[in-house]
């Protein structure tokens, strides 16, 4: 049976992650409070941030920026948006 959690991002009960996605305290906090669905949303957001900002993941400053954005996305006021991004419209 899947592990169910109260997702901090979605505000509903949902299936939890199978393991902490990141090392350290932030990874533990995400594991305990973020659903698989919300994590997938973050992976899309993270990809946009990396591409739009041309982040070099070998650069410690880029990794630090993404860690801050991860925390803001799940537990703060929301992560930065990729400049020029327009969400798709339905219809």
From Swiss-Prot:
GO terms for biological process: cellular response to oxidative stress. GO terms for molecular function: iron ion binding. The keyword Transmembrane does not apply. GO terms for cellular component: cytosol. Coiled coil: none annotated. It holds the Pfam family Iron_traffic. Keywords: Iron. Belongs to the Fe(2+)-trafficking protein family. HAMAP family: Fe_traffic_YggX. Could be a mediator in iron transactions between iron acquisition and iron-requiring processes, such as synthesis and/or repair of Fe-S clusters in biosynthetic enzymes. This is Probable Fe(2+)-trafficking protein. It comes from Burkholderia multivorans (strain ATCC 17616 / 249).
